[in-house]
Design a protein with these regions (language model features):
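C-terminal domain-boundary segment and adjacent tail
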Residues: 89-92, 111, 115-149, 157-162
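Metal-dependent polysaccharide deacetylase catalytic core of the NodB/CE4 family, i.e.
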Residues: 2-107, 139-141
Length: 162
C-alpha cells in the first residue's frame, strides 16, 4: 500500500467548489473531495498555499520578494498560509500538517514560520534523495515533480529507475 500526498491550493478549491463545471486543462478538487481525501487512509492532504500558486501578485510562489522586509514577508506568508488552514478547517474539519511550496519557491525564513504554525513537513521541487534522520529532516524534502507531457517510462528513466 502506498500513500499519496495531494497538495491543495485553497483559492482554486474555493473557485471550483462553486460549480460542477470542471476545467479540463487544469483539473482541480472541490472541498467535498478534499474532505473525502482527509478521511481516506491512503491520502495525506497538504497545504499548497491559499493564493500563492500564481504569479499575478508579483511574487514567485511563497518566496520573499527582493527588498521586502522580513516583517512584511512574515505577515504575508503567515496570513496566506493561515487563510488556507482556516478554509481547510471550515470546509473539512481538518488542517494539513504538510506544506508544499508553490513553484518550489521558498525563503530561508519559511521553515521556522511553518514550524511555529504547527506544520510537520514541507515539500520543495528540488530533485534528489531524502535522508530522514529526525523530525527536522522532514522539512525541505526533495521530490520528483512529474510535469505534464512526459511519459511514465521517461519520468522514471530520469530518476534512474527502469
Amino acid at each position: 500500500d502506498a500513500k499519496a500526498v495531494i497538495s491543495v491550493v485553497g483559492s482554486y478549491t474555493d473557485e471550483y467548489s462553486k460549480s460542477n463545471i470542471a476545467n479540463m486543462t487544469y483539473g482541480y478538487v472541490r472541498w467535498s473531495e478534499v474532505y473525502d481525501m482527509f478521511i481516506d487512509k491512503r491520502v495525506e492532504v497538504g497545504n499548497h498555499s491559499y493564493d500563492f500558486h500564481s504569479n499575478n501578485h508579483g511574487r514567485n510562489g511563497s518566496k520573499r520578494n527582493s527588498g521586502e522586509s522580513e516583517d512584511t514577508y512574515r505577515n504575508i506568508f503567515v496570513d496566506d498560509t493561515q487563510k488556507a488552514q482556516d478554509r481547510f478547517m471550515t470546509k473539512t474539519g481538518f488542517a494539513p500538517i504538510i506544506y508544499t511550496y508553490p513553484f518550489g519557491a521558498y525563503s530561508e525564513e519559511t521553515t521556522d514560520m511553518l514550524k511555529s504554525m504547527g506544520f510537520k513537513m514541507s515539500l520543495t521541487c528540488n530533485e534528489g534523495i531524502n535522508h530522514i534522520t529526525d523530525a527536522d529532516s522532514l522539512f525541505m524534502l526533495k521530490r520528483y515533480n512529474r510535469p505534464s507531457g512526459i511519459s511514465t517510462a521517461d519520468f522514471f528513466a530520469k530518476m534512474g529507475i527502469d
